[in-house]
């Protein structure tokens, strides 16, 4: 079976700073990820996920199959075709999730890039929204932002906290090119586990401040959980604090239209660029040297290697990782079209 491999080595600079006094209400004792906001957004995504996209899904399957065909891979092979169908369905749902939480005047913390999972609140199955080489041990959350406004993120760390992570500012919801970053190791946390980040366009050197570039549209928050017995993601909520600003909430029709637009953009980007130009163009069974990529969604403090392998049942591939100055590395393995195998039942990645 032809599979993809992606290795990331992350180097993070740390700086000792003091947390300024901040008086905020105690945060609710809820799941750090499955929050009431998350449940509300998941319910809306589930309601809208059958939006009229059959034509776009057909285009996506055809485009991905065309790309793999250029490299001698037959997408009509039953298991590959099944992988393709799953990947296209999840890519479509991920575009809907982006469209649901895209308004900088109505910012919410939304966990995305998840495998299919049941809703604990309402009992329905939430479709998977993985795409573009998700990391099974990453908790991904997004917040829409705009440099015109001021925001505050309030959070709380429980247990061991995450292994690694950070806040990456991106300027495009599809390509998700990095235009700024705040490494998690710079986050100053109070002794009770609480923390506050301020976000606006200023280049302040104050602790826990994130400067929003003029072209940023969203923050991708990553919490890496390497030891699921001791480490936990941080709880986070966001508030826009610019006075006197308001906007109507998005309608379901506008969300669906925006999702279709994101899907149309995603098809050539993830098929031609990520799968073809970034991955399959490399020699098979060779893990290429990691490089910095700002063109695709990788963190500014991260170097990455997009590679692919095709082994028989009697072959093995040995990969040697030399971490160098990196503080953390991960080696995930994916199905052909860039989503992880079932992380609940299969070993799909290794990390430091």
Mark where each language-model region is.
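A compositional/structural signature for long, glycine/proline-rich flexible linkers
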Residues: 19-352
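Fungal secretory targeting signals
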Residues: 1-21
């Amino acid at each position: 079976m032809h599979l993809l491999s992606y290795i990331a080595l992350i180097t993070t600079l740390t700086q000792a700073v003091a947390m300024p006094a901040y008086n905020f209400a105690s945060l609710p004792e809820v799941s750090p990820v499955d929050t009431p906001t998350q449940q509300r957004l998941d319910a809306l995504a589930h309601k809208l996920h059958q939006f009229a996209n059959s034509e776009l899904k057909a285009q996506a399957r055809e485009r991905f199959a065309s790309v793999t065909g250029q490299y001698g891979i037959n997408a009509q092979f039953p298991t590959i075709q099944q992988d393709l169908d799953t990947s296209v369905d999840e890519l479509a749902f991920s575009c809907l999730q982006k469209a649901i939480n895209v308004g900088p005047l109505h910012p919410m913390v939304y966990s995305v890039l998840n495998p299919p999972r049941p809703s604990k609140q309402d009992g329905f199955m939430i479709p998977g929204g993985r795409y573009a080489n998700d990391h099974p041990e990453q908790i991904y959350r997004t917040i829409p932002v705009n440099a015109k406004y001021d925001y505050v993120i309030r959070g709380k760390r429980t247990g061991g906290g995450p292994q690694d992570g950070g806040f990456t500012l991106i300027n495009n919801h599809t390509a998700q090119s990095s235009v700024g970053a705040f490494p998690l190791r710079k986050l100053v946390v109070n002794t009770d586990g609480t923390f506050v980040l301020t976000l606006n366009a200023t280049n302040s050197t104050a602790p826990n401040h994130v400067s929003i570039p003029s072209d940023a549209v969203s923050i991708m928050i990553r919490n890496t959980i390497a030891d699921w017995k001791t480490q936990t993601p941080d709880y986070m909520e966001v508030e826009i604090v610019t006075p006197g600003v308001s906007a109507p909430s998005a309608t379901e029709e506008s969300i669906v239209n925006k999702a279709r637009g994101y899907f149309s953009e995603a098809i050539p980007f993830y098929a031609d660029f990520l799968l073809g130009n970034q991955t399959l163009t490399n020699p098979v069974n060779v893990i290429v040297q990691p490089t910095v990529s700002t063109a695709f969604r990788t963190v500014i403090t991260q170097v990455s290697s997009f590679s692919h392998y095709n082994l028989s049942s009697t072959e093995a591939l040995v990969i040697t990782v030399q971490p160098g100055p990196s503080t953390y590395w991960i080696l995930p393995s994916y199905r052909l079209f860039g989503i992880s195998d079932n992380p609940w039942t299969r070993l799909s990645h290794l990390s430091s």
